[in-house]
Amino acid sequence: MVCLAFIRAAHEHLYLVRKVSHVCRCHQHRAWGSRPAASQFAVQGAPGRVLELLGKSYPQDDHTNLTQKVLSKVGRNLHNQKFHPLWLIKERVKEHFYQQYMGRSRTPLFSVYDQLSPVVTTWQNFDSLLIPADHPSRKKGDNYYLNRGHMLRAHTSAHQWDLLHAGLNAFLVVGDVYRRDQIDSQHYPVFHQLEGVRLFSKHELFAGVKDGESLQLFEESSRSAHKQETHTMEAVKLVEFDLKQVLTRLVTHLFGDGLEVRWVDCYFPFTHPSFEMEINFRGEWLEVLGCGVMEQQLVNSAGAQDRIGWAFGLGLERLAMVLYDIPDIRLFWSEDERFLKQFRLSDINQSVKFQRWFFQEERATGIQRKMGRQLCPFSKYPAVFNDISFWLPSENYTENDFYDIVRTVGGDLVEKVDLIDKFEHPKTHRTSHCYRITYRHMERTLSQREVSSVHQAVQEAAVQLLGVEGRF
């Protein structure tokens, strides 16, 4: 029999909707005994109601698509929790920039902002970065919207324009970012980015260059694969050289000397030329960051028309998983001491590798205590696989809507979701999807009975909230 608590949780937590007369803190919920109708939790949000987050109120509309699972992560700020692996990466990057790059008064050149609110306007997240109105990155299915005008930032780049407009020329921004995405060991709806920006005046860029006083930052020409229409080739090449030198030094600081690096041309709306940096780590090429010469239109609109600059962005989880051998992105949200205590280091630059097995004395028998502490597994508990298949509704279905339901109902019991089959009926032309959900707890073994209750709750929530027709 389906566990009603899971079903109620799906209805109660999937989309945060409240009557205006009952606006409250974002973690207050309806009583378990009152089971609301599925129509109250439509994917399109609840126009006329209000969402409260971080002390501010936001009217909901047809773009509201936040889940309680995601909202519960807002304010956790893992990157600011001392000794957390993401904090260690942030501190190592910050220390490197503080020590390597000094201003005229021998103070750090780069300022650091790691407590900016994750709630931004859609203008900040998209328009300020020159992202076109029809760009696919704006899709409701890929982002978490509070309403049409506000969202949880999809990247730390959302703060670039504001900080440039405030007169800053060199800064790092660190924060949690939110994207609707697939479910596997490498992806989570909340992750953390570190953004870097540096602007140069004509004097700063050409200082030390022979005949530098005769060189210019800007010209009127045509855009090419190598530069923007407003930049001189001399300026672009110097900015590009500085950017790549700064980032090569950074990854060498993190990974050690002798690291092999390569640059891959790519595209970002807010930089040109743009690059991805890859490193050869243990014989495998890994992408670690994206970067490029900032679009001058962005720089000009922020009030820095006399400067040219670069920007880069990297994912803290990606670096931490490689540096510390962390196998599953869910672990970053663990409060298990067996995980956290491994990163309490006296020196942030100390080498550490996550141990999947370790000694846990309290589980040992009396005889074992005499012989030594017991060796216990961490996150290697057996997986349980369950499939779900259903006919899609005629419209308004996205896979990310289903993934959000799975995350909301199953929480961190869900390790992975794979679309394993698509079928179109030859007569009705209806489409069916079949997903395989992998359940695995990070700290204990799950029973099939326990998983079946969660899985059945996922099935019912999908039917009631997405309008699919079950084939189970």
Curated annotation (Swiss-Prot):
Keywords: Acetylation, Aminoacyl-tRNA synthetase, ATP-binding, Ligase, Mitochondrion, Nucleotide-binding, Protein biosynthesis, Transit peptide. It is found in: Mitochondrion matrix; Mitochondrion. PROSITE patterns: AA_TRNA_LIGASE_II (PS50862), FDX_ACB (PS51447). The modification N6-acetyllysine is found at K202. Its EC number is 6.1.1.20. GO terms for cellular component: cytoplasm; mitochondrial matrix; mitochondrion. InterPro entries: aa-tRNA-synth_II, aa-tRNA-synth_II/BPL/LPL, Fdx_antiC-bd, Fdx_antiC-bd_sf, Phe-tRNA-synth_IIc_mito, Phenylalanyl-tRNA_Synthase. Mainly expressed in the Purkinje cell of cerebellum. It is an enzyme of class 6 (ligase). One of its GO terms (biological process) is phenylalanyl-tRNA aminoacylation. One of its GO terms (molecular function) is phenylalanine-tRNA ligase activity. Gene3D superfamilies: Bira Bifunctional Protein, Domain 2, Ferrodoxin-fold anticodon-binding domain. Residues 379-471 form the FDX-ACB domain. Substrate binds at S157, A158, H159, Q160, R179, Q186, H187, Y188, Q193, L194, E195, E287, F312. It catalyses: tRNA(Phe) + L-phenylalanine + ATP = L-phenylalanyl-tRNA(Phe) + AMP + diphosphate + H(+). Pfam families: FDX-ACB (PF03147), tRNA-synt_2d (PF01409). It comes from the Eukaryota. NCBIfam families: pheS_mito. Belongs to the class-II aminoacyl-tRNA synthetase family. Monomer. Is responsible for the charging of tRNA(Phe) with phenylalanine in mitochondrial translation. To a lesser extent, also catalyzes direct attachment of m-Tyr (an oxidized version of Phe) to tRNA(Phe), thereby opening the way for delivery of the misacylated tRNA to the ribosome and incorporation of ROS-damaged amino acid into proteins. This is Phenylalanine--tRNA ligase, mitochondrial. The lineage of its organism: Eukaryota, Metazoa, Chordata, Craniata, Vertebrata.
